[in-house]
């Protein structure tokens, strides 16, 4: 029963996430979904006509229709500019070195990088965000909690020669904030 509930919840979240990016997602895009997790977001993208490559540091999918490439979390096993779009959907704060994962996403993307991240605006919200993330992911030990503020994420994007073309704040459970970022490569 709990497993069915989690799958249903993941399916609903995947549909919601697709809606956040659909305006900037050309049809039939070649996409890499980095940190695919349950696989439901990759599945929604595939069902909408995109060519999706799913990668993660371990296979945590809850669907037989998605099989991620398991990689070391440091270097993606793809050439430069292999994908139209790299997607990092609520994954960077799970990484011990989010800057490296982000740079790899930019390296393998021809043009766009989509990011959805939990952000905080003060110390209380930082710790509440950490607690809620641990609870939602059932990860209470070994979670790096490398969340950043909006300004810190946006500084990382600039340092990597990316232009912010769309930003939208989304409230979660009324008090938490996620930010949608659509980024494009620019010449350094």
Q: What annotation goes with each model-predicted range?
A:
Residues 169-188:
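Core SAM-dependent methyltransferase catalytic element
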Residues 87:
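A conserved beta-strand element that flanks and buttresses the S-adenosyl-L-methionine
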Residues 21, 43, 116-160, 165-173:
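C-terminal alpha-helical "lid/dimerization" subdomain adjacent to the S-adenosyl-L-methionine
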Residues 1-7:
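Class I SAM-dependent transferase core
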Residues 32, 38-75:
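Class I SAM-dependent methyltransferase SAM/SAH-binding core
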Residues 10-28:
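Conserved alpha-helix/loop element of class I SAM-dependent methyltransferases that forms part
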Residues 91:
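Hydrophobic adenine-recognition pocket in adenosine-nucleotide-binding enzymes
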Residues 99-113:
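A short glycine-rich, Lys/Arg-flanked "PGG" loop and its adjoining helix->strand segment in the class I
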């Amino acid at each position: 029963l709990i497993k069915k509930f989690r799958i249903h919840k993941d399916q609903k979240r995947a549909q919601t996430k697709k809606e956040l990016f659909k305006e900037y997602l050309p049809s039939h895009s070649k996409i890499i979904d980095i940190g695919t997790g349950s696989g439901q977001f990759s599945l929604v993208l595939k069902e909408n006509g995109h060519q999706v490559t799913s990668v993660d540091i371990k296979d945590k999918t809850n669907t037989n229709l998605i099989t991620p490439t398991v990689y070391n979390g440091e270097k993606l096993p793809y050439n430069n500019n292999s994908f139209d779009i790299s997607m990092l959907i609520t994954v960077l704060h799970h990484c011990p070195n989010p800057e490296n994962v982000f740079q790899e996403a930019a390296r393998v993307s021809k043009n766009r990088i989509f990011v959805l991240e939990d952000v905080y605006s003060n110390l209380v919200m930082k710790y509440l965000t950490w607690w809620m993330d641990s609870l939602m992911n059932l990860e209470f030990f070994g979670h790096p909690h490398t969340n950043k503020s909006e300004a810190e994420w946006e500084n990382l994007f600039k340092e990597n020669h990316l232009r912010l073309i769309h930003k939208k704040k989304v409230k979660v459970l009324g008090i938490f904030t996620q930010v949608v970022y659509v980024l494009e490569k620019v010449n350094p």
